[in-house]
């Protein structure tokens, strides 16, 4: 029972920390507010996480783990390249839609120069959650070598796909205003967004022979 309570306390602290870092970023976050929101105190937080930096890095680690879980699953499935790319794009958009707070934290982190991400990559570079990007890169490079994709820069392609998926959510308020997107109809818009990105990426990556096959089906 004590172990269960310890895990519950730790999770409450992490949940409160997410809200704090979303609103204030790392530099503006206060441990006292996290303690109050989690129904604990600063001594308990320091007992579990040792420091504000360790707590923040634990939050970042959870973001990477959640973001890469679906990627790992897709890479482990025996699917065609087209189905793999479609699965990755659709599930990444689902992740962004369901976790807006995590995207906000990443924006704060990027604004600070990504110093904590750099530290985490050095610390956990060989762990699965931080190794998925390398696996995805190798997948694209291998398929390019086999002629299943056009000869493109794999790194640039991954960054482009991530940007296309994330841009709407990063700039959602202005996008809804500029493009007159009804918040009540957003689910349908996001559904169409998935289709548009998949279509654009597949037609940009597939060799001409594969494009012709897709048109015929």
Regions found by a protein language model. Give the residues of each.
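Helix-turn-helix
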Residues: 1, 12, 20-54, 58-59
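Generic hydrophobic, amphipathic alpha-helix propensity
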Residues: 9-18, 34, 59-63, 67, ...
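Short hydrophobic clusters on alpha-helical segments that form packing/core surfaces
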Residues: 13, 17-21, 92, 201
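Short coil/turn segments at alpha/beta junctions that flank glycine-rich nucleotide-binding fingerprints
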Residues: 23-27, 99, 146
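Short secondary-structure transition hinges
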Residues: 54, 93-135, 141, 156, ...
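Amphipathic alpha-helical linker/stalk segments
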Residues: 59-88, 139-142
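Hydrophobic alpha-helical connector segments
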Residues: 73-104, 132-133, 154-161, 191, ...
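C-terminal peripheral helix-coil segments that are non-catalytic and often amphipathic
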Residues: 91-94, 130, 134-150, 164-217
């Amino acid at each position: 029972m004590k172990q269960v309570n310890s895990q519950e306390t730790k999770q409450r602290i992490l949940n409160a920390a997410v809200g704090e870092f979303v609103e204030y970023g790392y530099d503006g976050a206060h441990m006292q507010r996290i303690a109050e929101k989690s129904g604990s105190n600063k001594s308990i937080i320091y007992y579990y996480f040792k420091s504000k930096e360790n707590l923040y890095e634990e939050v970042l680690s959870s973001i990477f783990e959640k973001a890469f879980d679906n990627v790992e699953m897709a890479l482990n499935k025996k699917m065609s390249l087209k189905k793999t790319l479609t699965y990755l794009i659709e599930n990444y958009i689902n992740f962004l839609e369901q976790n807006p707070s995590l995207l906000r934290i990443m924006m704060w982190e990027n604004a600070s120069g990504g110093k904590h991400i750099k530290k985490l990559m050095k610390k956990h570079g060989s762990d699965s959650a931080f190794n998925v990007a390398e696996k995805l890169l190798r997948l694209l490079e291998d398929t390019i070598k086999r002629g299943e994709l056009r000869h493109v820069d794999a790194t640039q392609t991954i960054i482009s796909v991530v940007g296309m998926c994330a841009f709407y959510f990063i700039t959602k308020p202005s996008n809804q205003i500029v493009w007159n997107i009804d918040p009540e109809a957003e689910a349908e818009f996001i559904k169409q967004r998935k289709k548009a990105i998949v279509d654009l990426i597949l037609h940009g990556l597939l060799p001409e022979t594969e494009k012709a096959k897709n048109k015929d089906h």
